[in-house]
Design a protein with these regions (language model features):
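N-terminal helical capping/dimerization or prosegment-like subdomains
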Residues: 1-74, 236-240, 254-257, 331-342
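Metal-dependent amide/peptide-bond hydrolase catalytic core
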Residues: 2, 164, 173-352
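Predominant activation on well-ordered alpha-helical scaffold segments within soluble catalytic domains
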Residues: 12, 32, 105-108, 112, ...
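Short glycine/proline-enriched coil/turn segments at helix->beta-strand junctions
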Residues: 36-40, 45-47, 59-60, 116-120, ...
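A structural signal for short hydrophobic beta-strand segments in well-ordered beta-sheet cores
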Residues: 42, 85-87, 221-224
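Hydrophobic/aromatic beta-strand patches that form the interior of the parallel beta-sheet core
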Residues: 63-65, 126, 153, 312-314
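Acidic/histidine-rich catalytic neighborhood of metal-dependent amide-processing enzymes
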Residues: 104-171, 175, 352
């Protein structure tokens, strides 16, 4: 079987189907039909589909191959039609081609090859929803239905290098209170001035623990709002902080430390998007090194954050093409990805 041609044809079909986050039903339907027509037993939960290699044995470790089928909405500036796949000069253009359709089809066809050979592990392929919005009806909900997972490959555009660690995300809504007064008189307590002290702390503070792969925790104040009119001293100032955690702190630990240092009332929108890190001695990581894959820590978030087990983020394409006009994937990147996934995992003992 020519897996590359089949993978490219499937990606072309996927591009024609709108699959914005939380609206993935039609592309999930299409993938389900594609697999059932080829004799695979497909399971489904909402807009997530998965299949297992034959002969599942609970005594063996289980390896998950996962990528997402949702896309962002097309940005301004597209010259080509985002839902019309076009191949020009070895590139396939279309929305979701790079992020992360190429990973979906490459992992799927690697699954087909690997599951046809004897392996020392169970293999599951899952195409999941809501990754782009860190939704709760994607991989997070699906993991409750799957057997225990020992390791996962998460397909995202990394040029087929291996992200063994990933920064987490916590968004903070912060509110500082003052006292209203007339701006012409020396009265009131300016909430903006109180907030400035907090904001300077967020700008300059360095947490003690620095990760070898991910570096320091990064905090950025990204939004601020205060005041009702020019002549009233504001009694309230609200601001938003984007916190990118490393694996040496949980989000709850960081939240507690931050609350001890600032005047604002601080509420986290969520603490569930944790930083992750896989030991460099893990057999899959060691195998990736042997294939001359660069081992690195990723500053960007993926479904890896929702996986409470060892994982590696690796997929065809380049992250700089994601969420851009005229998004594309090189055809040779899909061919290379299928080959590398197979060489990475075929015959490997993933126990650690």
């Amino acid at each position: 079987m020519n897996y590359t041609n089949d993978a490219v044809a499937l990606l072309s079909d996927m591009i024609t189907v709108e699959s914005f986050s939380r609206e993935e039903k039609n592309v999930a339907d299409m993938l389900q039909r594609y697999l059932e027509e080829r004799g695979y037993i497909v399971s489904r939960s909402g807009n997530n589909i998965w299949l297992m290699s034959p002969g599942f044995d609970p005594e063996r470790p289980t390896l998950l191959l996962n990528s997402h089928i949702d896309t962002v909405k097309p940005v301004a500036g597209w010259v080509r039609h985002p839902f019309t796949p076009v191949i020009e000069n070895g590139k396939m253009y279309g929305l979701g081609s790079n992020d992360a359709g190429a990973s979906v089809v490459s992992l799927l066809h690697a699954f087909m090859w690997l599951s046809a050979q004897p392996q020392s592990y169970n293999l599951i392929f899952a195409a999941t929803a809501e990754e782009e919005v860190s939704g709760k009806n994607g991989i997070e909900s699906l993991l409750r239905e799957l057997p225990k997972i020992d390791f996962a490959i998460v397909g995202e555009p990394t040029e087929m290098h291996a992200a063994v660690a990933e920064k987490g995300l916590m968004v903070l809504d912060c509110t500082v209170y003052g006292k209203a007064g007339h701006a012409a008189r020396n009265e009131g307590e300016n909430a903006i001035y109180k907030a400035l002290t907090d904001i300077e702390w967020f700008r300059t503070h360095k947490f003690d623990k620095v990760s070898e792969l991910l570096g320091p925790v990064k905090m950025s104040v990204t939004q601020i709002s205060a005041g009702t009119q020019h002549n009233v001293v504001p009694d309230k100032c609200s601001y938003v902080v984007d916190v990118r955690s490393n694996e040496l702190y949980t989000n709850n630990e960081l939240l507690s430390l931050i609350r001890q240092q600032v005047k604002a009332e601080v509420e986290a929108r969520s603490t569930r998007l944790s930083s992750t890190a896989t030991p460099l001695q893990h057999p899959v990581v060691k195998q990736a090194r042997s294939l001359n894959r660069t081992i690195f820590g990723s500053p960007t978030l993926s479904d890896q954050a929702l996986m409470p087990f060892a994982s590696l983020k690796m997929g065809p394409g380049h992250s700089s093409r994601s969420h851009t006009a005229d998004e594309f994937i090189h055809i040779h990147e899909i061919e290379e990805a299928i080959d590398i996934y197979i060489r990475l995992l075929d015959g490997l003992d993933i126990r650690f």
